[in-house]
Regions:
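Extended, charge-enriched "interface" segments that sit outside catalytic cores
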Residues: 1-77
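Extended, domain-scale alpha-helical bundle/helix-rich regions
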Residues: 76-108
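N-terminal glycine-rich flavin-associated loop
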Residues: 103-119
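Internal maturation/activation junctions in enzymes
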Residues: 116-166
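Short, solvent-exposed loop/turn segments at the edges of secondary structure
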Residues: 103, 135, 152-154, 178-180, ...
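Buried hydrophobic positions in well-ordered alpha/beta secondary-structure cores of metabolic enzymes
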Residues: 108, 140, 168-170
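A short core secondary-structure module
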Residues: 169-199
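Secondary-structure capping and boundary motifs in well-ordered enzyme cores
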Residues: 35, 54-55, 79-83, 100, ...
Length: 199
């Protein structure tokens, strides 16, 4: 690939990431795969309602490795998706399912950086672009019972401005990356035009 693409930005980081998968990641992925899926913790030990999605610690180890390698922040620092997709290629070779949180995080940060309110961007983007374990994950919550990828036709969730935010009313049939810290949600403001431009 290097012969066709020229020098690879972050080549050392990519080699280190692949090496990590060979040394540790494969075994973690295999063990996590056998251990089962995440589970919902509805209450803490004191009976307080928490509704927290729990994953094995090893899962977080795998996930954070890709974030720290730059699957998100490199796309912005290098003004290109190439390194991000190269990291994703390595990740997908070893654990295809793990690439999903990365792609939906990109699908969150890109429209947010382009269309988000300045106050939201100032609050959220720095957290999603961190290069350490405290990085925020993103999610996209679009699909409704009508289904399909035609958001303009099938999104019935409404958005009503309330104070500094919005109240959303509706149901999502599928949401990606339920363990995310922030989500982009498709909704139609009350009185907005039909079609995708009204979302």
């Amino acid at each position: 690939m290097k012969e066709f693409q020229g020098p690879i930005a972050g080549e050392h980081a990519l080699a280190e990431y692949e090496g990590w998968w060979e040394r540790e990641g494969k075994a973690i992925s295999s063990a996590h795969d056998r251990a089962g899926t995440p589970w919902l913790q509805m209450f803490d030990v004191f009976g307080k309602r928490v509704d927290d999605v729990q994953c094995a610690p090893e899962y977080w180890s795998m996930l954070r490795k890709g974030f720290k390698t730059g699957v998100i922040w490199r796309a912005f620092k290098e003004a290109s998706l190439l390194s991000s997709f190269r990291i994703g290629y390595i990740c997908s070779f070893y654990d295809a399912g793990l690439f999903c949180p990365y792609t939906v995080s990109l699908s969150t940060i890109l429209p947010l950086s382009k269309y988000g309110a300045e106050t939201v961007k100032a609050s959220v983007l720095p957290k999603m672009l961190r290069e350490d374990d405290s990085v925020w994950q993103g999610a996209t919550w679009m699909t409704e019972a009508g289904g399909g990828s035609d958001l303009g036709r099938y999104v019935e969730t409404t958005a009503r401005p309330v104070g500094d935010g919005w109240t959303l009313t509706g149901d999502k049939y599928f949401t990606s990356n339920a363990i995310a810290d922030v989500a982009v949600v498709a909704a139609r403001p009350e009185g907005a035009a039909a079609g995708v431009r009204g979302l």
